[in-house]
Amino acid sequence: MPAYRSRTTTHGRNMAGARGLWRATGMKDSDFGKPIIAVVNSFTQFVPGHVHLKDLGQLVAREIEAAGGVAKEFNTIAVDDGIAMGHDGMLYSLPSREIIADSVEYMVNAHCADAMVCISNCDKITPGMLMAALRLNIPAVFVSGGPMEAGKVVLHGKTHALDLVDAMVAAADDKVSDEDVQIIERSACPTCGSCSGMFTANSMNCLTEALGLSLPGNGSTLATHADRKRLFVEAGHLIVDIARRYYEQEDERVLPRSIASKQAFENAMALDIAMGGSTNTVLHILAAAYEGEIDFTMDDIDRLSRKVPCLSKVAPAKADVHMEDVHRAGGIMSILGELDKGGLINRDCPTVHAETLGDAIDRWDITRTSSETVRNFFRAAPGGIPTQTAFSQAARWDELDTDRQNGVIRSVEHPFSKDGGLAVLKGNIALDGCIVKTAGVDESILKFSGPARVFESQDSAVKGILANEVKAGDVVVIRYEGPKGGPGMQEMLYPTSYLKSKGLGKACALITDGRFSGGTSGLSIGHVSPEAANGGTIGLVREGDMIDIDIPNRTIVLRVDEAELAARRKEQDAKGWKPVEQRKRRVTTALKAYAAFATSADRGAVRDLGDR
């Protein structure tokens, strides 16, 4: 039977000093021997998705104590990708994921915690904590801060649902007046919580439900709604229960690697494809699988993307649909329920809260449950009042959205498209693959060919787009923005937003070895692997080269013969695979350390230390 890890520091004569220090934190004689649970919080006043988390860590801690555990809270960093966007701050976003994972490992292992509750929310925080949970493999429960309410605004007599991306697009559109831009800006992000569409943060919080590591409703219950409090309360009790099951009953089924197995990762990816999640989720799922030593690769994602249909379209793919609408339609358990009806998930995977995922779906899918408690839970609605306070309103929808033919969530028989919301493309420009969010691509450009407009950085691409140097029919190529080449693999939300503002959202393609914000839509192809800095073919593209993109057939091809590519490669080898133009970019020691070990996106941009 496994011993409680914490007894390393709480038992034995030689631990008198450690116990003395524990006592100084408030522990008493009766606490030594109880499971010590780390409450891993990520509160910060920099990020709207985390600004309301300050007191929630202590809420969980009180419930842990009430359940017979000892709670010890610490904090991780949290970067706001939206605020860091469009300048060198974005170089730090993806590397912060590794810092978060490492910091959780450092604190948990240094103090010998027995289990942990991870309170996350935004883009890199949930992935970083997920990586840590799979790396440490101690009992863990995830509970996120929840999504923001969508903005609402009346412009010229018409009501619009808004999010962050609308503010960015409006600001870059010369046809939108300064007055209207200000109105949109003030209305786009009305409450605390993760940005309101199916962007990276919400996508990842939804995936924790499919992985079995969080409670039903974690991905879709609004941050402001009183119903969300129950998730934090239950997480506190649940973690003590599963910690005892592992340490006192030797039940390894409650460990993260037992719950988040390869089959669970396939369930999560099937969900991601069905709901048209952010392309960043691919990066993070691969990284989490790597930490858990799970054999889950781009080939698995490609296989799943060919058989799982798109069952939901949420902003940015469908501008007037947000997470509050997904919740009203039954949330993630109902999307999983539709996949289950189509035989597209594994029902037998365990979860932290139910014996199997199938049991959870049967209880929580609003189209199959008879529980009025469950149905009432999914009636939780936005309050429509700007606030930074969690659980501050209790509005309800009058009716649920159970329309599986034309509603927010569709059945397998009535999908938005038979092809899923994400696809892996391969070809000579992306030998190890690249990712496109097909849910955000207009049907008219699923096949696209055009001449390359090559930019050596996001900054130069933005200047070129705003200066009208990009024309309809062009394929914008942004390179040397990968994990190593950036470094840090910047998001390209500004280039795609500016293409939209110029009326080119359905007339151009954009490919990059960088990545995209979850708020990106259009023919935006990212994660091109190998990246330019690693000798990838994207580094050989020249101005005017023709590029053919065929999403239905999953191909992307640079129309240059092999002999010419070989000659260009020899030339680049001599130059050391660096950008042609000098970039005004300060790469600090911290960023250099990340770049030294970062792999390309097809491996999740994890660090390769040569030990695997």
Curated annotation (Swiss-Prot):
First-level EC class: lyase
Pathways involved: Amino-acid biosynthesis; L-isoleucine biosynthesis; L-isoleucine from 2-oxobutanoate: step 3/4; Amino-acid biosynthesis; L-valine biosynthesis; L-valine from pyruvate: step 3/4
Subunit annotation: Homodimer.
EC number: 4.2.1.9
Record key words, sorted: 2Fe-2S, Amino-acid biosynthesis, Branched-chain amino acid biosynthesis, Iron, Iron-sulfur, Lyase, Magnesium, Metal-binding
Taxonomic superkingdom: Bacteria
Pfam families listed in its UniProt record: ILV_EDD_C, ILVD_EDD_N
Protein name (record): Dihydroxy-acid dehydratase
GO BP annotations, alphabetical order: isoleucine biosynthetic process; L-valine biosynthetic process
Family named by the database record: Belongs to the IlvD/Edd family.
Function, in words: Functions in the biosynthesis of branched-chain amino acids. Catalyzes the dehydration of (2R,3R)-2,3-dihydroxy-3-methylpentanoate (2,3-dihydroxy-3-methylvalerate) into 2-oxo-3-methylpentanoate (2-oxo-3-methylvalerate) and of (2R)-2,3-dihydroxy-3-methylbutanoate (2,3-dihydroxyisovalerate) into 2-oxo-3-methylbutanoate (2-oxoisovalerate), the penultimate precursor to L-isoleucine and L-valine, respectively.
Entry annotation: catalytic residues: S517
